[in-house]
């Protein structure tokens, strides 16, 4: 396994208690929407992609949630999860990994994940090769 640091943009968090919520709930709201049409659950660098995809979605009200600890978030009672997810019409999940664990929150067609072995190379080139881009995620959001 090879690890590398990515040059990721730092984003403003809508949740002012994000550090506490990340530690105690495993997730926090990055971009809020009062009555979201869609909530995107994302982890790691996919949060940046989710924010870009949300900006490309046509007329949709979108909440973006960072889920750095999926196991902790999944262990919360449904009422606590709903406080973070909101009450959207759809939940879309994205991760540069398999979708299995995300299926408890979204339908298979709403999991924008990589359910196959990848390839090696610069992160942006590999993502483009695999079709794992903000533009492709925006297509799912616009369905």
Residues covered by each model-derived region:
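Thiamine diphosphate
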Residues: 2-143
